[in-house]
Swiss-Prot record:
The keyword Nucleus does not apply. This is Large ribosomal subunit protein uL2. It comes from Oceanobacillus iheyensis (strain DSM 14371 / CIP 107618 / JCM 11309 / KCTC 3954 / HTE831). Gene3D superfamilies: 2.30.30.30, Nucleic acid-binding proteins, Ribosomal protein L2, domain 3. The gene is rplB. GO terms for molecular function: rRNA binding; structural constituent of ribosome; transferase activity.
Amino acid sequence: MAIKKFKPTSNGRRNMSVSDFAEITTDTPEKSLLSPIRKRGGRNNQGKLTVRHQGGGHKRQYRIIDFKRDKDGIPGRVATIEYDPNRSANIALVHYADGEKRYIIAPKGIKVGQEIESGENADIKLGNALPLGSIPVGTVIHNIELKPGRGGQIARSAGAEAQILGREEKYTLVRLSSGEVRLILTTCRATIGQVGNIEHELVRVGKAGRSRWKGIRPTVRGSVMNPNDHPHGGGEGRAPIGRKSPMSPWGKPTLGYKTRQRNKPSDKYIVRKRKK
């Protein structure tokens, strides 16, 4: 999928770029796999703001995605490749031989009409899902489970990939795109290939209004707030923050401060930490 650039006919268009959606084969989603999404504007069930910079945006419907890939032994055929407003990756509608339809994350290079399957005995082929123990060392994978049967949790966004490096007893060594090397149970499933729509990171929004269409509200600097709103606020004119290090709105150190819980139970599965 290529990136389309615009002529500078206005200030908003000057640096704007969009995906050309060349891979998309239909603009009509499968009705039976849609679910309503109620906008919350970053508020919790008490109406309190818990996530900043959220609100507004175009109305969406959630596409129910098959992250578990547990339909073993039943072949499926890719019917369409579709845009999903809820994620950076595209999705593929799969028609299975028993009549069921499911959405999956669309891997790079998948085509309409291609056959896919899941299970321990599936071929090592793009789009097929197998347990990590059945996938050869060196294979590029995505949509990786952390617990058997829970569904894929890692490497699901546009262009994401991981690679199998080796095996240790009942675990498989997997290198993630962050550079982290992690031990994952060999009974956990993953899908062959890299997630598609890899040019997504090259898209330039171009104007503030396009962020608002996505439901992203403005981010205000702490230094222009009042002191009761932010630790950086207050002072006369363009005052410095007046602290040893930058702070979050709640007074915690930020910008480089480590927030990962110490002695986290999953630390024992991390063989090599991610690149800084």
